[in-house]
């Protein structure tokens, strides 16, 4: 009889004992890895640390999850879906807007200007969470929590204060939505993975970067560009997802403990995202970067980018059909209720 790694984990979980405290343990313990393309100082890393701390407080060493940040396991976000689905790694924190090729619904959170504030980004997550969870479940995974990126802006050699500033700009984008929007705006976008960004800047492959202020701070982009323009373009979501076979193999009270801490994780993640914005601005200015806030960006720039993103939003609705329409309707309802 041949035993796969998954069947072994199920058997091990089923034969585990309980400590006197009622915490489930196994003879060898249950150990997982959690992949993250980004590092422990990035917001995805901080969100992962909080999740692991909260889990440890509830279950002790019944489940040990090792955070593997900075692409330590050799996976980028675009690889995580297959890696977790196949059981090559038990868990991952993934920038899901890079998974649009698997299901276009994943592109929702990076639709240009759909959510313009952290509060709206939370409402969009609440409106769409059920559909996200369904996609993961249908592919052998369990969705846990989300971590929003701070609003994206443009790091460039000069502020983006006119549509002409985008013309021919060789700009890094992080997903298909950004690529198509920037192309429509007359720029020359190139989708570049996080790990390849600095080499591209160093060799002149790109001149500008579409990312958040926190991302700019993490990469010390002041070494390459002088300006950050606040555009509140999008707040793409990271999501933590785990292999369903591995999750189902856990003792029931461990599964329950994981699910119980998820609301606290979302609340914490949104709070650190909001706090990160001013922290990043302060650090960038201390290192010589000029920050152009959205109030100082001419209205014509936003109107121009809104127009450039119109077809991107329309295409997403066409690709996702009733699913997309239903989620957008729920999103508008939540916004209306919030006043």
What is each model feature region?
Residues 2-22, 26-120, 128, 132, ...:
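N-terminal secretory/targeting leader peptides
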Residues 123:
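Short beta-strand-centered segments that line the small-molecule binding cleft or hinge
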């Amino acid at each position: 009889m041949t035993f796969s790694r998954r069947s072994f984990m199920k058997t091990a979980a089923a034969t585990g004992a309980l400590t006197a405290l009622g915490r489930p343990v196994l003879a060898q313990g249950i150990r997982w890895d959690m992949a993250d393309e980004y590092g422990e100082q990035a917001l995805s890393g901080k969100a992962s640390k909080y999740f692991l701390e909260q889990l440890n407080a509830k279950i002790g060493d019944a489940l040990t999850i090792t955070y593997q940040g900075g692409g330590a396991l050799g996976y980028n976000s675009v690889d995580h879906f297959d890696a977790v689905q196949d059981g090559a790694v038990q868990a991952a924190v993934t920038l899901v807007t890079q998974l649009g090729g698997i299901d276009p619904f994943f592109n929702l959170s990076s639709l240009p200007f759909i959510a313009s504030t952290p509060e709206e980004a939370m409402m969009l997550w609440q409106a769409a969470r059920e559909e996200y969870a369904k996609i993961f479940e249908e592919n052998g995974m369990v969705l846990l929590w989300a971590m929003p990126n701070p609003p994206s802006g443009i790091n460039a050699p000069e502020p983006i204060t006119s549509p002409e500033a985008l013309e021919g700009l060789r700009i890094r984008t992080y997903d298909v939505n950004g690529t198509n929007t920037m192309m429509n705006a007359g720029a020359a976008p190139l989708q570049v993975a996080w790990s390849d960004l600095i080499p591209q800047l160093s060799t002149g492959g790109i001149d500008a970067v579409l990312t958040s202020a926190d991302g700019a701070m993490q990469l010390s982009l002041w070494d390459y560009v002088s300006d950050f323009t606040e555009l509140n373009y999008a707040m793409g979501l990271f999501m933590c997802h785990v292999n369903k076979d591995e999750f189902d193999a856990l003792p029931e009270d461990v599964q329950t403990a994981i699910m119980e801490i998820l609301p606290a994780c979302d609340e914490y993640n949104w709070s650190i995202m909001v706090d990160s914005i001013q922290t990043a601005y302060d650090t960038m200015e201390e290192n010589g970067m000029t920050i152009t806030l959205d109030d100082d960006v001419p209205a014509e720039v936003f109107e121009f980018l809104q127009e450039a993103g119109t077809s991107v939003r329309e295409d997403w609705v066409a690709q996702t059909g009733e699913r997309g329409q239903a989620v957008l309707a729920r999103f508008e309802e939540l916004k209306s209720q919030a006043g």
